[in-house]
Amino acid sequence: GMMQRMTKHDHHAPNDDPAAAQPPFNPPMTGLITWLREGLRAGWLLTPRPTGQGPSAWQLLALAVLSTMVWTVLARLQVVGPASFDTQTWLASWWSLPALMWLAWWALPFVSLSTWLALALVAGVPVEVVTQGVAIADAHGVLPAAVLRNAWMAWGLYLIYWLWVWSVGVRLVHVLGASRRRTAGFGLGLAVLLGLSAWQFDTRVWAAERSG
């Protein structure tokens, strides 16, 4: 009778809530190729478009290894002839990463730090390829001698390098959602880190071996 209909209705009532019936939202994992592509976009001052979840621990490791290999190989090509690898200098070149990660964490309180790091690791590749490519060409005598032997030309290339690195870093935190105030703070901190790197740290990890 009526009691049975009410009991039947009440039995199904808890399942009428759409939110209760839906499984939790779990966006798909972003593939490694996507992180590489979008990181390179960021390196050319374009807007990255990652989709899905942040990177996995293994993806971050792969991105770090790949970007480091590019930088290390480019540095080796700048030295003509036999060269030795300076492990201590290579390790010291990573000194600024913890400070940079803290700055990004502060600037992006609502964005996963792993997302920023995945893009930032790859975003530095284009500027390294272009600027170190010029240095490699000079070291192997491809460029006219007057290009980098001229102090103004050398300082001009150096300035382009630092402005490019700084612009990529600032734009990346901005497009990921940092406020204007925090973007400005990140830019100031990044400028300080770049200045300290240029002033206090030798980043040449390959040294020409002396014959004899």
Predicted regions and their residues:
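Juxtamembrane "helix exit" motif at the C-terminal ends of alpha-helical transmembrane segments
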Residues: 69-82
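Membrane-interface helix-boundary motifs at transmembrane edges
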Residues: 51-55, 108-116, 174-183
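Alpha-helical transmembrane segments with an aromatic anchor "belt"
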Residues: 79-147, 156
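Alpha-helical transmembrane segments of multipass membrane proteins
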Residues: 67-71, 96, 100, 127-131, ...
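N-terminal juxtamembrane cytosolic/stromal segments of multi-pass membrane proteins
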Residues: 6-70
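Internal/C-terminal transmembrane anchor helices
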Residues: 183-202
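Membrane-interface segments at or immediately adjacent to transmembrane helices
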Residues: 203-212
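Cytosolic-side transmembrane helix boundary signature
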Residues: 161-188
